[in-house]
Amino acid sequence: DFVMFSMHVHENRYAFQAYSQDHYPANYVRELAHELIDNGLDMYVGHGNHTMQGIEIYKGRPIFYNHGNFAVQRFGSDDSPPNSGNLTNIEANELRDSWLQQYINLVAFAARTHYEDGKLVEILIYPLDLGVDASKTPWSRSSIPQTPAPELAQRILAEVQRYSEPFGTRISIENNIGVIRIPPEETVVVGQDLKIPGRGPAAR
């Protein structure tokens, strides 16, 4: 079996969501990810903060603290509450959610993990553009992930590099794709039984 844990969390180190412009997880998030892996988890995936955060390899297992806004819906549905000024739902939402139009909320990444004989050996990181250049992005494609232009891809990957460095994660950039290679001494066989704290011998 392969055990993955996903958590929706808005906090970063200093504040709620992206308002502090911080790209690192709150301490309790990292502690939780480590404890879960200590008890048999194979992969941690966080989301909800709206901005990219780093990648950590802990005991040979990946921790994706936040991929960014992979696909975020910026426009309200027809049953949205009435708004003042006779604005359409799209107009009202664009004004109300202007923070979603900031650069940090319009870049993200997807990742693919590669295993051999049950061991993580490589992670590929694919940068995503959710409409950074509004002048070139049709309204209908806004906030929908697309392959970025080479220059933007390099910028996004360099940022993921920087956010991952404090965790000791080394990311190389090859043909506009980020690559993490796991040294043999860091690999751990996945699929071990998940030990839940508080149950049986795993209790602390």
Q: Where are the language model's segments positioned?
A:
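Beta-strand-turn-beta hairpins that frame and shape the catalytic cleft
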Residues: 1-3, 59-63, 118-121
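Conserved beta-sheet core of the metallophosphoesterase superfamily
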Residues: 23-109
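Intrinsic structural disorder
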Residues: 18-19, 27, 204
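Short acidic, glycine-rich surface-loop motifs adjacent to enzyme active sites
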Residues: 1-20
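Solvent-exposed coil/turn segments that connect beta secondary-structure elements
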Residues: 10, 68-70, 118, 128
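Short active-site-adjacent structural elements
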Residues: 14, 54, 73-74, 122, ...
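Conserved residues at the C-terminal ends of beta-strands
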Residues: 6, 47, 126
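A short C-terminal boundary segment appended to hydrolase-like catalytic domains
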Residues: 79-204
